[in-house]
């Protein structure tokens, strides 16, 4: 099947060039006069390394003039020599699309890693495609209910929107993404595409095995370009995953979830490639084309009429600095931001979402409803007031607070603990079953806590549980002791 904005291969026969220079992952290739390949075309070259033949794929990045092109290698260039013959494939890097990709692991070039050769006989799409036209975009706004209390109440996700998970190392970004994949597969029977961009190979293996164990692998396609791969691969793997997701949206008319872990590594790979191509670095050493590269990716992640791609993107924040150009550029494209805070994680509250700094553009009465909005604002007000009182408590102690402030602090502590929740993917570590809390129950529970119905309950009764039934059961257990 062909779509209007699908990249089509050239009808011309393959053109051969030769390697004239190799500088790490950057390769200069000379072609016959007038037969230079187009930008983003895939080139292939055969090499022999220690008596083992392999094919290296290159992607055209620049036209240098004098019939020379500069290409970025998608594999280590060991064994590549000057004079080696290079073939222009006449089309961009292409990946398999459709049901064949579900339940399997691919690399950025579309090669199946768990079942070599899978998908190469079927339909393939080029990874460089135009975003949907303006008149194809969906105008209505709809909430994506996750069953995670802190998200549904305070930073609701938009169906077909872009969500950023911000946080430093080790605060739970990948765990939250794994939990979302599990919940979407269980609750909505939806299709998910996971793009592992520049993260640890061990995490990719763990994710594959966990999804297989939990029975959600058959509804998910996984595309990996991990930390040990060349920068060209890490820069393109997000586009490969997005292309698979676009097929499910545009051809199969499905609502798709696209998970990208980690979007910062996409930026980092672009910076490496930019330096290798000889471009002058911009702020903090990033590439001068940072905003443009991010826009090309993000503009394709959108809802069209009747179907959507909802994207959840983990964003590593270097040294917890939110003014760094990489996370700052990502902010501009997001509909909701979920900030994971180290200070909350240190209290043992997971997910470690900071309710005061996380945002959502749809948290307004006209979209989520008056009651939801009012309860969310009450929760935020109590938590904010508690934060303001912490300095006084640290210096003078709780006894110096007014009675009203004491009640506020005690309710804030209960709310803070109740915002934590058991995850399905963490069951085998904690021994506590995961919980799904419907949005209506979440709103009702927080309204009752804000009203003071549970002021007599100890804070420990609210630790990382599901709904109010769990709180009451925990309280009953504590009183029996």
UniProtKB/Swiss-Prot annotation:
Keywords recorded for this protein, A-Z: ATP synthesis, ATP-binding, Cell membrane, CF(1), Hydrogen ion transport, Ion transport, Membrane, Nucleotide-binding, Translocase, Transport
EC number(s) reported in the record: 7.1.2.2
Q: Pfam families per the record?
A: ATP-synt_ab, ATP-synt_ab_N, ATP-synt_VA_C
**What does the record give as the reaction this protein catalyses?**
ATP + H2O + 4 H(+)(in) = ADP + phosphate + 5 H(+)(out)
What does this gene product do? Produces ATP from ADP in the presence of a proton gradient across the membrane. The catalytic sites are hosted primarily by the beta subunits.
Q: What family name appears in the similarity comment?
A: Belongs to the ATPase alpha/beta chains family.
Q: What protein am I looking at?
A: ATP synthase subunit beta
Q: Which organism is it from?
A: Corynebacterium jeikeium (strain K411)
